[in-house]
Amino acid sequence: MNIKNILWFTLKKLSNLSLSISLLLLIASISIIGTIIEQNQSIVYYQMNYPINNQPFGRIMNWKIILNLGLDHIYLNPCFVLVLVLFFCSLLACTFSNQLPSLRNARKWKFLQYKNHINCNNHFVELDKISICNIIYSLYSNNYYIFHKENNIYAYKGLSGRIAPIVVHFSIILTFIGSLISLLGGFTAQEIIPTGEIFHIKNIIQSGFNSEIPNNITGKIKDFDIKYGPDNSVEQFVSKIIIYNNQGKNINQKQVSVNSPLILKGITFYQTDWKIDTLRFKIGNSKIIQQPIIKYKINNQILWSCRLPLNKEKYIFLVIANLNDKISIYDISNNLLTSIKLDETIVVNNTTLKIVEIMTKTGIQVKTDPGIIVTYTGFFILMLSIVISYISYSQIWVTSIIQNIKIAGSTNRATLTFEEEIINIQEIYTQYTWS
């Protein structure tokens, strides 16, 4: 078997519709797994959420299986990328070997000159009395493109409906190319920054082979705020970000929220998460003390707490429910002693206490996606092609034999509408021929 035969055999296998559908279903299945299993998390996260001793699912899916199979970064897994490449090649092969030749064949003028060819079509009408001019006018009135040769007529309309499958293939290929550009040239960084601090893009959690991390900009979190609803639930959290260049010049700033990112030269800054980091306070006449705060989840409610020593023997616990409420103070027996506001001084067990500041951190995701325009263009063309696919491709053949005109037609969809068109053509022809 020579190289030409091998290439032809490979092309034939790749252009197989069953293979394309199987690959598409495989891609969809892998994507579902990637949606169920959280991506790009730490090993500790998977150990906590997918323990081996979890019955009965621990034997089927645990953290070791997830890490060994690469399910923690499934969209970057070489096997998934290989499936995408195969699907891409299958679409290309199908487009050039099946769809384009089919379109070229559809554009040919097809005159059927023999009675058996006419009669074998889906719709057939025979009219008395011959008038080529009137039948042409009847077809033209129904928006058909008409070709006339001797005693034969070929007409069609809705050729764009035949183009739709090619456009679908092209849009999927374009979407794949956009995703590939993003995969190779994009990066994602995640930063947790205290309010008022300057940050650099350094905590890279995902990067492409050809991605470039910008080193000529720095950012600063000037302010952070949380908006609460009437029931004290978090509705929105907002960070004011200032971007500086290497010379320290302010080149952009914006109040960033969850659905309103900052975009600068193809780099997007998203608001992701937030947390209370540290509590600053004074005990008695001491200097300002900083105490880390630990996050808890109790009865589906998020709380932050820290333990403060009043002296060598006595401790109290400070509990924060949200930034708008007072800070609750408990003793070691979990009894509520009192509540305190920021900058308020109270006396607890003969010791003065003043809360100076609640220090928060905001989560900022920095991302570049160079293929996003190509991807969105592919999706737009895909939606457009779906609309185009509903256009019926209809063909009509007319031939005059002795004293009769034989009309045959076929369509790829909307059969009832096409039958109505045949009847309308017949009525117009009869009206002008017999009047």
From Swiss-Prot:
> Keyword set for this entry?
Chloroplast, Cytochrome c-type biogenesis, Membrane, Plastid, Thylakoid, Transmembrane, Transmembrane helix
Identify the InterPro entries for this entry. Cyt_c_bgen_Ccs1/CcsB/ResB (IPR023494), ResB-like_domain (IPR007816)
Assembly mode: May interact with CcsA.
Descriptive protein name: Cytochrome c biogenesis protein Ccs1
Q: Which GO terms describe its cellular component?
A: chloroplast thylakoid membrane
- Look up and give the organism this protein is from: Gracilaria tenuistipitata var. liui (Red alga)
Q: Could you tell me the membrane topology recorded for this protein? A: Multi-pass membrane protein
Into which family does the record put it?
A: Belongs to the Ccs1/CcsB family.
Give a yes or no for keyword Chloroplast in this entry.
yes
Where it sits in the cell: the answer is: Plastid, Chloroplast thylakoid membrane
Say yes or no: keyword Lyase present.
no
Give an example GO biological process.
cytochrome complex assembly
Segments traversing the membrane: 17-37, 77-97, 163-183
What task does this protein carry out? Required during biogenesis of c-type cytochromes (cytochrome c6 and cytochrome f) at the step of heme attachment.
